[in-house]
Amino acid sequence: MNILYIEPYYSGSHKYWINSYKEFSKHNIHILGLPGRKWKWRMHGGAVTLANEFNKLDKKFDLIICSDMLNLPVFKSLCNNIDDTKCVMYFHENQFSYPWSPNDPDIKLNRDLNYGYINYTSSLISDYNFFNSNYHKESYLNELKKYLNKMPDFQNKDSVDVIKNKSSVLHIGCSLTKSNSIQNQFVEPVILWNHRWEYDKNPDLLFQTLFDLDEMGIDYNLIVLGEQHQDYPKIFDEAKNKLEHKILHFGYCHSRDDYVNLLNQANIIPVTSNQDFFGISIIEAVSSFCFPILPYRLSYPELFDYNNNKINFYKTDIEFKNKLIDVINNIGSYKKTSNTISSNIINQYDWSTMAKKYDSTFLKII
């Protein structure tokens, strides 16, 4: 089967996802993308540019998969010879549920809902919609209902059910390599941060807790990874100074091999995020035997099977602190649990498994 993937924001996790699927898939996948910058302009203008590029292609596709950053109605209206080709949306994020920076001028000017509307019309016109977690799917549908309820008339509320009836969950596949160093990993506690340096990841809770633990004389080491932009939370600078004596690495890692090696040095990943539709960075860390400490919210109870792994979850900030202290002080006793969780995660989300699921799912669409 020949698949075309349309990506206005071909960068970061979006690029990682489709490139990995292309590598493991039995289908032929062609990628049509634009550089990942100026996301608002990509959601508005990307469809026009990509439609022009599509019309230059001398190839017939069986299926078109579109990123949530694409304005699908505009794209389809400008494309030649596309009417009989099925188009599906894959939602990494959506602009109804995704938290905006309070400093964004579009919020003050009441322009922020325009991007959610693009998601709405795209999911309405698509032949099918996939979401990277059930939490994401339900969050999107609930926020869409709220959005339509705010409209003055002709709210088209029945369109929510139309979208719901052609939507399902297709978890993200990950390139997971099982560490061979578990015996050494659980000698000394090494805490890992490998998420984006963004406010929605709630770094303040983690680092303020680590400051407290340092003052209490609790011994641990720290590895801080993750992509950062110019306007990152300043708690990272404070952490770099206050915890300098505990830091093994601090900053973005450009090499994939170096990144994996650093994951393999860590054994605890405390998660404090207020927003996460999936959690690739956490899946990667857990596959390297890091013991996850997870909030009981977002996609985590779904991905990490809360009913069978309650030991990994917390519900309050105090519970988070106490659980982190316990894991640090008793790191050796958590080795067996981490091994079990890691094996389950690899078996479930590695591309060797997920690519087969993707391939069969997309075949059923056409």
Where in this protein do the model-derived segments appear?
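Short hydrophobic beta-strand element within catalytic cores of glycosyltransferases
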Residues: 291-294
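Aromatic "clamp/platform" in nucleotide-sugar-dependent glycosyltransferases that forms part
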Residues: 274
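Nucleotide-activated donor-binding/catalytic signature segment of Leloir-type glycosyltransferases, i.e.
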Residues: 161, 226, 234-254
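Conserved donor-binding/catalytic core segment of Leloir-type glycosyltransferases
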Residues: 130, 171-175, 182-201, 206-212, ...
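Donor nucleotide-sugar binding/catalytic pocket of nucleotide-sugar-dependent glycosyltransferases
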Residues: 124-180
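Short alpha-helical donor nucleotide-sugar binding micro-motif in glycosyltransferases
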Residues: 260-266
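A charged, aromatic-enriched C-terminal amphipathic alpha-helix characteristic of glycosyltransferases
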Residues: 41-45, 315, 319, 332-365
